[in-house]
A protein has these predicted regions:
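The conserved Walker
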Residues: 11
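Loop/turn-to-beta-strand initiation segments
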Residues: 66-70
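Hydrophobic anchor at the beta1->P-loop junction of P-loop NTPases
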Residues: 7
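Conserved substrate/cofactor phosphate-moiety recognition/catalytic segment
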Residues: 20, 24-62
């Protein structure tokens, strides 16, 4: 059996960026839950038409069967009890709300430019997402991680990605 590492954090915590770098360092496959839930259209995720949870679960199962060593980035990783045994480690990426929200706005501007500003065709959609992200309870991830039986590593998502990757690689290899 391979190794599954779950990176959890609220929107803007940096779990996708960290997950890609960690997967590369370990030679693992990277899976982003956004890719499971939101089909890509014109190289951009279609947030307006998310897949159903069952479809995302099926896609995740396919990924895990094909790539037994993987890093999954997800807010919680709650894909159902059948998936919990797939994770040998879980990582909580914690970042203060103000920083997360700034990252989300910066990322949105990077993706959509002026389209996400007032008057732009993405303005309402992006603002709705920012309100949603800001309203999420800070303990959402922590509470969900308590349901797992694998070790949970806490991480400061404000630190440089390279530093966190090295820390995680040491934690995982040292056990």
């Amino acid at each position: 059996m391979g190794m599954g590492i779950l990176l959890c954090g609220l929107n803007g915590a940096g779990k996708s960026t960290l997950g890609k770098a960690l997967a590369e360092k370990l030679g693992f496959h990277f899976i982003d839950s956004e890719d499971l839930f939101f089909p890509k259209t014109d190289a951009q995720p279609d947030y307006a038409r998310p897949r159903k949870k069952e479809e995302a679960q099926r896609l995740l199962l396919e990924e895990i069967k094909f790539h037994e060593n993987f890093v999954l980035a997800s807010v919680t990783g709650d894909f159902g009890q059948d998936f919990s045994p797939c994770f040998q480690y879980a990582v909580q990426v914690a970042v203060p709300k103000e920083i997360r929200m700034k990252r989300l706005r910066d990322r949105s501007f990077s993706q959509f430019g002026g389209r996400m500003l007032p008057g732009g065709d993405r303005y309402e959609q992006e603002e709705a997402f920012f309100r949603f992200a800001e309203s999420r309870a800070e303990d959402t991830v922590e509470n969900w991680l308590r349901t797992l039986s694998c070790p949970v590593i806490e991480l400061d998502g404000r630190k440089p990605v390279e530093e966190n990757v090295l820390f995680l690689a040491e934690q995982i290899k040292g056990k």
